[in-house]
């Protein structure tokens, strides 16, 4: 049986850990609220962008922009959105499991058939350590990323499709549903499907100058990059929700462990006192 000193040391150590996890839970809660606000504030812009793309592409059945054209797939690009820090529950593991399974299924891990652009140190370290074909990365992204801060990697992803280096581009990220629920999504960004640019648009009665093809040349890359930015904002909310849940569970588990250790400590202390009393009584009896 552990000594009283050992048990007391474990209780104190667990209490300190509990204080840390509780503080991290509170920080994640605050960051989650800001991340949700950022994601929600981006929705109106994304809706307007979708309307513009639908108005131009949907009404132009002869649109011949490369980003709308399917072609034989020789190489596939994957944009993987993870985070820089751990202690976020299954957040990173689920995303990485999703993308590695798809790479195995589609390419049998042949590096000539795919390339990965990764956001987040956890994803980068994981994929590099396992010799996946990582061709670009962003590390150290802010909790409230600006469009400018992700411009390099989003532009790289889109331009590699435009130049033919990638024949299709997928994005893997965690979609925020609620504090307790997040889902890993795989979204095909490029080529943009005809269904995605078809349908009704609030801008359908507008006139476009100089012409729709010229506007498509500008707006389609912006649209694809906006999809990436929206997924990053969504992923940030998922990250903080997952970390908040993980820290709450850790705090609750620490409390249970402290209760168990306290009970164990009291029993050991009671046994020690009983032993001392027995020895005193036995010694007194021996003197009679």
Curated annotation (Swiss-Prot):
A single GO cellular-component term on record: plasma membrane
Stored SUPFAM superfamilies: ATP synthase (F1-ATPase), gamma subunit
GO biological processes: proton motive force-driven plasma membrane ATP synthesis
NCBIfam families: ATPsyn_F1gamma
Function field: Produces ATP from ADP in the presence of a proton gradient across the membrane. The gamma chain is believed to be important in regulating ATPase activity and the flow of protons through the CF(0) complex.
Assembly mode: F-type ATPases have 2 components, CF(1) - the catalytic core - and CF(0) - the membrane proton channel. CF(1) has five subunits: alpha(3), beta(3), gamma(1), delta(1), epsilon(1). CF(0) has three main subunits: a, b and c.
Family: Belongs to the ATPase gamma chain family.
Identification of the protein by name: ATP synthase gamma chain
UniProt source species: Macrococcus caseolyticus (strain JCSC5402) (Macrococcoides caseolyticum)
